[in-house]
């Protein structure tokens, strides 16, 4: 049964990649001329109308939305062209530390990010760039979830993200946990969470967790999640030790 389910998932993933490739191709072409035209109009009449005029607001809206569409197209393209992994024996803790450098000066003020990395881990066959992208996707998701919870609740609560690694010798795996105290995963989408285009974000594409799941599958691992009793969610990446 599990093998059949995995085959079906891979078949759906291939079909969705083709859809993503076509969407990216069809949307990408007209975006640049639309943006350039809006910017040209914006510059041409900037001195003739007030900053708050309907023309200025409308052209700025066009420019902003085109930028949003370009980001979506980029995600579609990344999903459609997930490269085959090129694993080499690596220190997953080092990959995590290097990746988290990106967040040192960019974390929202009310969110703390801490690590609990096991000091004794075996090296793993990893594509370091792909694992780096997995960590970024999971941390970005955690930040979004915490920020969403903050807008829904009137009571301020410090946002917390915890990243931990651990070795499970009995199962011959290393686990990477990314835990947050955000909104958790809604039961309505839990069964489809790793399917493409499943999202609750206003401007999300629903591809981040799909890319995470596919990448870890390519590493012969598993991606799991569980809602926490205290609120929030913990994503667990299980990677085999060779």
Task: Give, region by region, the residue ranges found by the protein language model.
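Short helix N-cap motif at coil->helix boundaries in the Bergerat
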Residues: 92, 184-192
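Conserved HAMP-HisKA connector
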Residues: 4-26
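A conserved beta-strand-to-alpha-helix junction within the catalytic ATP-binding
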Residues: 86-100
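Glycine-rich ATP-binding loops of the HATPase_c
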Residues: 220-226
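Conserved catalytic submotifs in the C-terminal HATPase_c
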Residues: 110-122
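Histidine phosphotransfer helical core of two-component systems
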Residues: 31-67, 87
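ATP-lid-like helix-loop hinge signature
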Residues: 143-172
């Amino acid at each position: 049964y599990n093998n059949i389910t995995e085959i079906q998932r891979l078949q759906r993933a291939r079909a969705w990649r083709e859809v993503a490739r076509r969407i990216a191709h069809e949307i990408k072409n007209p975006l640049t001329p639309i943006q350039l035209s809006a910017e040209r109009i914006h510059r041409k009449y900037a001195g003739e109308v007030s900053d708050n005029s309907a023309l200025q607001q409308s052209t700025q809206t066009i420019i902003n939305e085109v930028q949003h569409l370009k980001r979506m197209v980029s995600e579609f393209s990344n999903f459609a062209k997930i490269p085959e992994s090129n694993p080499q024996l690596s220190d997953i803790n080092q990959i995590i530390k290097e990746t988290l450098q990106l967040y040192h000066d960019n974390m929202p003020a009310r969110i703390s990010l801490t690590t609990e990395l096991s000091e004794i881990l075996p090296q793993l066959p990893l594509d370091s760039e792909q694992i780096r992208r997995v960590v970024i996707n999971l941390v970005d998701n955690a930040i979004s979830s915490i920020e969403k919870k903050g807008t829904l609740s009137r009571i301020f609560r410090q946002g917390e993200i915890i990243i931990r690694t651990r070795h499970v010798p009995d199962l011959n795996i290393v686990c990477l946990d990314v835990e947050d105290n955000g909104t958790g995963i809604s039961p309505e989408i839990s069964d489809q969470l790793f399917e493409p285009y499943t999202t609750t974000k206003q401007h999300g594409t629903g591809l981040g967790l799909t890319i995470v799941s596919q990448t870890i599958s390519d590493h012969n691992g598993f991606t799991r999640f569980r809602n926490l009793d205290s609120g929030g969610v913990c994503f667990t990446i299980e990677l085999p030790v060779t």
